[in-house]
Amino acid sequence: MERIRKKPIAVSRGAIVFAFNSSKYNYAQMAVYTARRIEAFLGIPTTLVTDIESFKTIINDKDVFDSIIEVEPDTSNMREQHAWINKGRYQAYELSPYEETLVLDVDYLVNSDCLLKTFDLSDSFCCHKNTHMLMHPEAAQEKMSAYSYDTLWATVIMFKKSNRAKQIFETLEMV
């Protein structure tokens, strides 16, 4: 059952993206591209959360962002022998300047205005439960372990400032 808001509410809406460059990828440059697509397809502002070293690589493109928040990156997460700085997304609730926020991976391509519909849902927190692999359409959905819950995906999150959303982000910080 779809839960839709009965009346539209005038609130601040925007997107927040996290970008910390690695030795392999320039995530800040990806964030610039993503912010341009967010503006073109969704018509909402984008806030960038990054570190000073990553920001230096896009200083000429800084105007694409509504605001830029500099944070100290958590480099303790390793993936394939490289630092994978992706642990700070639990801060999205506190860092977002918007009442209603889309949290997007910088490598997620916005190609339509469909994500705007998430703001019309009455839920205060939404994320994807399922993935669809184009090259492997029959692939099983991932679980955190064999005896665990289904994996929920943080590629796209919509949240509204509320007690429920705040509690979810506080829980994410503990994981």
Model-assigned labels for residue ranges:
Residues 1-175:
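Glycosyltransferase catalytic domains, chiefly GT-A lineage
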